[in-house]
């Protein structure tokens, strides 16, 4: 068998791929805005939010980085119709789950950030899992090579 997929994916496959790419670009943007936050911007945050950032363990930041960068790579792999997109999305989901474990059970993130942060955390987990399932579905349909 050659490196080409045997079945042409439907138009909605490409729409999902673009949505996945945009979603993950938002995640990368959020990560970069945190990673490169200036002291002046940090000083404008409420004290409780500053404390969240200052006390967050390095492994949580690493999980965040893994989640967003592998999510972006998985989205690009889908657009290139590569089977390894699924493995990259699994890595992204692992990063998501580690990060959300901390936010949900090991910190007071939701007390400080409110209900919106809780809803966003749930959506991130759902979207991460959906991308793993979608990549698996696309692979099973021979849309990926």
What are the language-model segments listed below?
Residues 1-145:
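Topology signature of small-to-medium multi-pass alpha-helical membrane proteins
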């Amino acid at each position: 068998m050659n490196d080409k997929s045997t079945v042409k994916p439907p138009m909605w496959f490409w729409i999902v791929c673009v949505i996945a790419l945009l979603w993950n670009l938002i995640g990368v943007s959020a990560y970069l805005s945190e990673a490169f936050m200036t002291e002046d911007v940090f000083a404008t945050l409420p004290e409780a939010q500053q404390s969240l950032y200052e006390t967050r363990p390095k492994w949580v930041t690493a999980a965040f980085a893994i989640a967003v960068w592998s999510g972006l790579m998985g989205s690009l792999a889908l657009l290139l119709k590569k089977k390894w997109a699924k493995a990259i999305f699994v890595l992204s989901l692992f990063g998501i789950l580690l990060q959300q474990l901390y936010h949900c059970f090991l910190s007071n993130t939701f007390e400080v950030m409110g209900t919106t942060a809780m809803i966003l955390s749930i959506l991130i987990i759902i979207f991460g899992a959906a991308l793993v399932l979608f990549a698996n579905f696309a692979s099973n349909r021979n849309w990926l090579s």
